[in-house]
Amino acid sequence: MVKFQIIARDFYHGFIDSFKGITFVRRIREEEAKEVKVEPPKPVERTVLMMRREKQGIFKRPPEPPKKKDSFLKKLWQIYAMNIGFLVLWQVCILILGLFFSFFDRTDLGHNIGYILIIPIFFASRIIQALWFSDISGACMRALKLPPPPVVPFSSMLAGTLISALHQIFFLIQGMLSQYLPIPLITPVIVYLHMALLNSMYCFDYFFDGYNLSFLRRKDIFESHWPYFLGFGTPLALACSISSNMFVNSVIFALLFPFFIITSYPANWNRKYEEEIPKIAFCRISYMFTELVGKFVKSITPTNNPTAARNNAQN
């Protein structure tokens, strides 16, 4: 009974925390307004003598004023525009493929191929958003008075983003296949659990990317604090199930998704209770497939280590 109460409380905290972005956005804007504004120096007419001294190194030209950064809201609107743009591109591809295959009386095949195109589009959007969201992430950190995350090499950031995105695709497939389970009353609950947890994975990935948390560490966090993440992802899961039209639900997701990413920064998912929350390995299947793909890619990727290459050749 105590464990059930703890699970319910953690779910409640996650659900409530998912709406913190409403006040947090205002806090970010207030913090942005407090930033020191550097006024550019007044232009001074340069004489021939000043230019001659600049060449000789006697007189140095004053430094250029720092470029003004894009505002938080401008970056946010850019991400909104990109999300909608990717969705429109996806729909155009579906229409073109459907029209092309209609000449062979295989319109459905064209549409199905178009739906599969969401996978490469999803990968592209994740990479671009990871780059664009860095400024928003910095604004969130400053509003929370947190130290900036350590600088991560681009290659490491890209690898982590791709692995995480691949795992999310497998987890999405796992959730979609679960709707075919022959359990009438329980099957919808299982599907909902997958979608809510998947939404939390999407939202918290950007925060975890900033701190360069490994994929295994993220997996352990989600499986150890699953009631919280279940509650956090519930509002987005409910909003994206309003319509039976996949495109409409995708538009709703694209509009709400950046807001919930911002909300993940002030969220407190690591609460302590009287007893530990039972860990559920709901990522086991998707993790297994992600690991298999990772090993396959590693096996076909040429190594730069001559010793390792020599050992592989001898074996």
From Swiss-Prot:
Recorded topology in the membrane: Multi-pass membrane protein
Primary residence: cytoplasm
Alphabetical list of Pfam families matching this protein: EI24
Residue ranges of the TM segments: 84-104, 113-133, 146-166, 190-210, 221-241, 242-262
Tissue expression remark: Expressed in pharyngeal and body wall muscles and intestine cells.
Keyword Glycoprotein: no
Entry keywords, A to Z: Autophagy, Cytoplasm, Membrane, Transmembrane, Transmembrane helix
One GO BP annotation of this record: macroautophagy
Record has Transmembrane as a keyword: yes
Cellular component terms per the entry's GO annotation: endoplasmic reticulum; membrane
Localisation per UniProt entry: Cytoplasm; Membrane
Disruption phenotype: Early autophagic structures and lgg-1 puncta form an irregular shape and clump together. RNAi-mediated knockdown results in increased lgg-2-positive autophagosomes following fertilization and at later embryonic stages.
Its biological purpose: Involved in autophagy. Thought to act in autophagasome and omegasome formation.
Family affiliation: Belongs to the EI24 family.
Protein name in the entry: Ectopic P granules protein 4
Record lineage: Eukaryota, Metazoa, Ecdysozoa, Nematoda, Chromadorea
